[in-house]
Amino acid sequence: MEHLQKSTYGTIVQGPEAHCVQESSCLRILLVGKSGCGKSATGNSILRRPAFQSRLRGQSVTRTSQAETGTWEGRSILVVDTPPIFESKAQNQDMDKDIGDCYLLCAPGPHVLLLVTQLGRFTAEDAMAVRMVKEVFGVGVMRHMIVLFTRKEDLEEKSLEEFVTHTDNRSLRSLTQECGRRYCAFNNRASGEEQQGQLAELMALVRRLEQECEGSFHSNDLFLHAEALLREGYSVHQEAYRCYLAKVRQEVEKQRRELEEQEGSWIAKMICTVKSCWSSHTAACALLIVLGLTLLTTFINLCISRCK
């Protein structure tokens, strides 16, 4: 696209796969979100090739974590697709293995967690997926998150900024604020210049995120364990892999408790704020309660009169 300004990283080009995890300059992107939200199709759009199996249906076809590579004008890019591990019903005996393998594929840690959600369809399941991402990767993960909306074509004449700004979905508004208003949209059926433009927008956000994080990637104790296992060669030492999965279980449980403590602390602060407001504005609060009860009584009487 001639009028499109290139980012620092340039444009995606196809090429042979490489183990770019070993390269210090490798950009690691981890796809997260609920099942069937379009993670695999988004990965294919980023790489501009059918690297991940993707079907147009509401159920996930990704059963295990999968890593594929591409380049962005000389810089290697690793894209990791994930199985259904970010939802409450995903708790099963293979959960530890799925999470552990995901850590191994994007060790020493992702620069970007790309939360994929369908435009206009941010549901309670999506909100649960966000919470599960925090449980799996730690409460600090939002610092490295970008929200990517699929079905960009549904915007029609409306801009994405307008959609996000005027949405009445409180959970979505809270999410975009929490991740620093880093979001973009993809039409995963796009090709040519349209696809190129989408990629340029995403990479501009990636560049902004890396500047904000001073080039750092998301890491925690479990990523350190994953790196140690990779150095040992876990394919040969199965006992080391079993010990690693035990650490996965322990660390995820620890991160879950930390998240609950953080949420509990926030609720406690809100209660203290309400109490403070009540004690200093007792008369005003009492008046609001009386007015509320009056309006409720009037509404009930109106409903009764209409039913007669």
Swiss-Prot record:
This protein's UniProt keywords: Endosome, GTP-binding, Lysosome, Membrane, Nucleotide-binding, Transmembrane, Transmembrane helix
Mitochondrial intermembrane compartment spans: 305-308
GO molecular function per UniProt: GTP binding
Record topological domains on the Cytoplasmic side: 1-283
Binding site for GTP: G33, K34, S35, G36, C37, G38, K39, S40, A41, S54, R151, K152, E153, N188
SUPFAM superfamilies (UniProt xref): P-loop containing nucleoside triphosphate hydrolases
Domain spans labelled AIG1-type G: 24-227
Function according to Swiss-Prot or TrEMBL: Plays a role in T lymphocyte development and the optimal generation of CD4/CD8 double-positive thymocytes. Inhibitor of GSK3A. May act by sequestering GSK3A in cytoplasmic vesicles and impairing its translocation to the nucleus. Consequently, impairs GSK3A-dependent transcriptional program and regulation of the DNA damage response occurring during T cells proliferation. Required for the survival of bone marrow hematopoietic stem cells, as well as of peripheral T cells, natural killer (NK) and NK T-cell development and the maintenance of normal liver function.
Name listed for the protein in its UniProt record: GTPase IMAP family member 5
Underlying gene: Gimap5
